[in-house]
Regions:
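Acidic/histidine-rich helix-loop elements
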Residues: 49-78, 107-113, 156, 279-322, ...
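Active-site mouth of glycoside hydrolases
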Residues: 25-33, 39-237, 242, 248-250, ...
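Active-site region of glycoside hydrolase catalytic domains
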Residues: 158-321, 330-351, 382-385
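Amphipathic coiled-coil/heptad-repeat helices and related helical stalk/stem segments
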Residues: 79, 328-329, 372-373
Length: 437
């Protein structure tokens, strides 16, 4: 009986997801939509994680990685049928984290990208657009040459600007004829990740005005580079990352996206990421200051061994776990959405674990995972943020994986159902703010 109920529930879920997919229309394949209008079509989104961004920092400014890097962090080459399956499962957009500099540069002076690599990126972008998805490509961590090295106290800022400009001119030229369903994101997590072998100096404090000012300078370079290539890039929607893509840092007055000067009107979005709270989402070993959390509020055993997130300490106060999520996402609504800048949650997720390794209850841990994903997805959408769940195609636990790409099926029903349940809860409010244009 329980199996039948689960099957029926899954069928109902799929029916909801399919109903939310708006058919493509002529306006979508042009360039007339503002960022806010385009946002209507984008949620929910999913990442092609650990794939086209896979790299080795020792390969910076070389062409040593080649096409084989696509499967260096996970096993499967991306297929068009897999991307089509994402649309069928209820997703409306795809984020493709991308490396360009660490292993795919044939001429450092001109920042020329390996033609074979560019062709492969374009092929996957085409998979997404042909499937009816909006698509984001970015300059990801890429060995740290920008996200770390460009933000140190001894960085040659003018040199980084020029190299970054050349890189984005070369990328943008290749996509200048692509319609508005393709979006560019400047970076990934500026200020996060290790230094490249060429780094000099120490990282600026990410919460400082100096860091925010430098980030905005680089984002202006990105914006100007893309616009300079003309064609459809003149009006393409571009996505800007807050410091470290952390909500609290992006909220600070020091990071002011309105300072960016754009020749196109209302074509900018902001981006942050969400892996909160750390003890539940990313922590994998107990520490003297706390334990790995296995359970989310309302889903714990009687003896949880101190592994439940009921409240979260924030600014010296204990905040209800669910309220904490709401508080964080509403910061982004107030800072950006209410001022006309849609917000992309470029990544969010929590590692589902083998609870037995911690002496825990697997069933209640799995329920907790589903509850977290549902709550986070719903609250993001109700705050009119565009969520992109992180997915890496790693099957053994721990993982942040929804799908088995080789088989093109859902491989983690707990995470997937959590995301789709949350989307069902949040999309009505989301579409009130972002109605169909």
């Amino acid at each position: 009986m329980r199996k039948i109920v689960m099957i029926l529930a899954a069928a109902a879920q799929f029916a909801w997801a399919s109903a939310q997919v708006a058919p493509a229309d002529r306006r979508m394949t042009k360039m007339g939509l503002t960022a806010a209008q385009l946002a209507h079509y984008m949620a929910p989104g999913v990442n092609l994680g650990n794939t086209m961004e896979a790299c080795d920092w020792n390969d910076i400014f070389t062409n040593n990685a080649g096409l084989k890097s696509e499967t260096s962090w996970q096993n499967d080459k991306t297929t068009e049928s897999y991307i089509q399956s994402l649309k069928k499962q209820g997703f409306n957009s795809l984020r493709i984290p991308t490396s360009w500099v660490a292993g795919h540069i044939v001429d450092k002076e001109k920042m020329t990208i390996d033609p074979a690599w560019m062709l492969r990126i374009k092929e996957i972008v085409d998979y997404g657009l042909n499937a009816g998805l909006c698509v984001i490509i970015n300059e990801h961590w890429d060995g740290g040459w920008m996200e770390h090295d460009a933000f140190t106290n001894l960085a040659n800022v003018s040199e980084h600007k020029e190299m970054y400009r050349k890189l984005w001119v070369n990328i943008a030229k290749q996509f200048k004829d692509y319609d508005q369903r393709l979006l560019f994101a400047a970076l990934n997590e500026p200020g996060v990740g290790g230094a490249s072998p060429q780094a000099k100096g120490e990282m600026l404090a990410p919460d400082s005005k100096e860091f925010a000012d430098r980030l905005l300078e680089y984002e202006q370079v990105f914006l100007d580079a893309v616009r300079s290539t003309g064609g459809k890039n003149a009006k393409r929607v571009l996505i800007m990352q807050g410091p470290k893509t952390e909500i609290d840092l992006a909220e600070k007055d020091t990071y002011d996206i309105a300072r960016l000067k754009d020749s196109a009107k209302n074509r900018l979005m902001a981006e942050v990421h969400f892996y909160d709270p750390y003890i539940f989402t990313l922590m994998d070993k107990d520490a003297d200051w706390g334990k790995v959390a296995l359970y989310w509020k309302g889903h714990a055993p009687a003896d949880d061994q101190g592994r439940t997130v009921n409240t979260i300490s924030y600014n010296n106060k204990n905040v209800d776990a669910y309220q904490h999520i709401t508080n964080l996402v509403m910061k982004m609504k107030k800072k950006f959405v209410d001022k006309g800048y849609p917000v992309v949650i470029g990544e969010y997720g929590a590692n589902r674990k083998d609870a037995f390794l911690y002496g825990g209850n697997q069933k209640l841990h799995d329920e907790s995972m589903m509850a977290w994903y549902s709550s986070v997805t719903a609250e993001m959408l109700k705050a009119c943020l565009i969520p992109y769940v992180w997915d890496i195609n790693v099957q053994p636990l721990p993982h942040m994986t929804l799908f088995n790409r080789a088989k093109e099926v859902v491989s983690d029903s707990y995470i997937f159902k959590g995301v789709m349940d949350g989307a069902e809860i949040g999309m009505e409010t989301y579409h009130k703010i972002y109605p169909k244009p």
